[in-house]
Amino acid sequence: MRPCVFLLLSLGMLGAGDGSLDRATLHGVTSMNVVIDRLDPELEKAGITQDLLRSRVAGRLSMAGITVDPAALEFVGLRIDSFLARKGPASLSLSLAFFQPVLLVRDQKVRTASPTWEVSTILMVAPRPLVQSTMDAADQLADQFVSAFRSVNPK
């Protein structure tokens, strides 16, 4: 039996969170951090770690000439929600977003980080290629970000 990966939905390809207004919020950004949300311990047992994902996403950004700076206030955040069945395929939802500091108009003492650009994808994957399929999906999302970033910040 051949392992197979099913791409159920790629919201990034539909343009959700990657429209012209979303891309405009990336204009003028000079550097960014890379943050990986806490992962399900089962994903870590399978070999998918925050460090592996962080280095993978940061590497894609660096290869595209985007400065990765751990001290930057702006950051690219990757979130993975998962359901790992004991038998059968795993279900993964990956979301990559760009977060920037924002102030509330009505109360400028309130500061927070908010996503201003985002793409997502959902996978169903057999257990054997789980790590590689997850890395490939993270690469695709990072590449979508690079494309969006470069569309408003040409080299």
Question: What residues fall within each predicted segment?
Answer:
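A structural "domain/chain start" motif
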Residues: 7, 12-55, 147-155
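Arginine residue identity/basic-tract feature
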Residues: 2, 23, 38, 54-56, ...
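Surface-exposed short loop/turn segments
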Residues: 64-67, 72-132
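C-terminal/domain-edge helix-coil "capping" segments
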Residues: 17-24, 103-155
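Sec-dependent signal peptide recognition
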Residues: 1-7
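N-terminal, post-signal-peptide region of Sec/Tat-exported proteins
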Residues: 46-75
